[in-house]
């Protein structure tokens, strides 16, 4: 008896297939080690170019043209705004660090061909983002509020430290290092309330008003005196002129009297001689 024509080989019998062969080949090539061309071993002051070693450029210079069999490396200086700090085989120089004033930064060391710029904080700012040896961002110092004192001033790395004034003291604008003691003024006015650390007693207002009144009164008095003073001066001048005129007239009268010829009446004097002739002394 012959088996039916549609019967095939048993299912457990394996037949080679093309996909299996492809998988084996793929795994074989995948596991094979890959070999890359080895780079030449160059000295510390050289850099590899293909299979050759070329001399490096000095700090502040970049490679313009690599070396050849008969020529050395051609180097040229870094352009402004760029730098290279070490021996190198770079074809481009590095860009200098920019210190942005909008971030509160300033250059504490300017950039050169051999050194990068170092940024620090502008006056009144402290660093909030440190990046290596330079600062990347700064912030303005905090301002103490009225009623606070400056406990510790800000530095380039630390903000200003503020502290509230203790009871019985005050700070009007927050810029003082030590709070001021509140003044007792019971002789002038009763205290309206407990003094706060940022405001003083009410007597400041009253005493200030009193001072203003006194100053205004003094100024008004001075103005009145100055306005009246010219009239008094005029009277004094008139009196002085009259007095001088009278003195002058008196002196003129005296001079005229002295210079006028004397009013003398000449009287003839007759000399008489007593006659004793014919008379005796007894008569």
Swiss-Prot record:
Cystine pairings recorded for this chain: 42-53, 54-67, 57-75, 78-93, 96-111, 99-119, 121-138, 127-135
Glycosylation sites: 110, 173
Cross-referenced Pfam families: TNFR_c6
Transmembrane segments: 203-223
Subcellular location: Cell membrane
Modified residues (Phosphoserine): 240
TNFR-Cys repeats: 42-75, 78-119, 121-162
GO biological process annotation, one example: cell surface receptor signaling pathway
Any one GO CC term of the record: external side of plasma membrane
Function description: Receptor for four distinct ligands: The TNF superfamily members TNFSF14/LIGHT and homotrimeric LTA/lymphotoxin-alpha and the immunoglobulin superfamily members BTLA and CD160, altogether defining a complex stimulatory and inhibitory signaling network. Signals via the TRAF2-TRAF3 E3 ligase pathway to promote immune cell survival and differentiation. Participates in bidirectional cell-cell contact signaling between antigen presenting cells and lymphocytes. In response to ligation of TNFSF14/LIGHT, delivers costimulatory signals to T cells, promoting cell proliferation and effector functions. (Microbial infection) Acts as a receptor for Herpes simplex virus 1/HHV-1.
Domain comment as written in the entry: The cysteine rich domain I (CRD1/TNFR-Cys 1) is required for interaction with BY55 and BTLA.
Subunit structure: Interacts with TRAF2, TRAF3 and TRAF5. Interacts (via CRD1/TNFR-Cys 1) with CD160; this interaction is direct. Interacts with LTA and TNFSF14. Interacts (via CRD1/TNFR-Cys 1) in cis and trans with BTLA; the cis interactions inhibits the trans interactions.
Stated family: Belongs to the tumor necrosis factor receptor superfamily.
Protein name: Tumor necrosis factor receptor superfamily member 14
Taxonomic lineage of the native organism: Eukaryota, Metazoa, Chordata, Craniata, Vertebrata
Gene this chain is encoded by: TNFRSF14
């Amino acid at each position: 008896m012959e088996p039916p024509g549609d019967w095939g080989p048993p299912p457990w019998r394996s037949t080679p297939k093309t996909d299996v062969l492809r998988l084996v080949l793929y795994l074989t090539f995948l596991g094979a080690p890959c070999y890359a061309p080895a780079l030449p071993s160059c000295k510390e002051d050289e850099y590899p170019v293909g299979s050759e070693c070329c001399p490096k450029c000095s700090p502040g210079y970049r490679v313009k043209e690599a070396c050849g069999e008969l020529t050395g490396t051609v180097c040229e200086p870094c352009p402004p705004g760029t730098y290279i700090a070490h021996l190198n085989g770079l074809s481009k120089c590095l860009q200098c660090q920019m210190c942005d004033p909008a971030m509160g930064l300033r250059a504490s060391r300017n950039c050169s061909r051999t050194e990068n710029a170092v940024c620090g904080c502008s006056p009144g700012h402290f660093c909030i983002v440190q990046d290596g040896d330079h600062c990347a961002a700064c912030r303005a110092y905090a301002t103490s509020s009225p009623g606070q004192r400056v406990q510790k001033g800000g530095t380039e790395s630390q903000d200003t430290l503020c502290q509230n004034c203790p009871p019985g003291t005050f700070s009007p604008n927050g810029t003082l290092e030590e709070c001021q003691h509140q003044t007792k003024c019971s002789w002038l006015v009763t205290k309206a309330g407990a003094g706060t650390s940022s405001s003083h007693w009410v007597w400041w207002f009253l005493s200030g008003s009193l001072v203003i009144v006194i100053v205004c009164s003094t100024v008004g008095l001075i103005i009145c005196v100055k306005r009246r003073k010219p009239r008094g001066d005029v009277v004094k001048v008139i009196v002085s002129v009259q007095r001088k005129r009278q003195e002058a007239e008196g002196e003129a009268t005296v001079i005229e009297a002295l210079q006028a010829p004397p009013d003398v009446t000449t009287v003839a004097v007759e000399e008489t001689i007593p006659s004793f002739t014919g008379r005796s002394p007894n008569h």
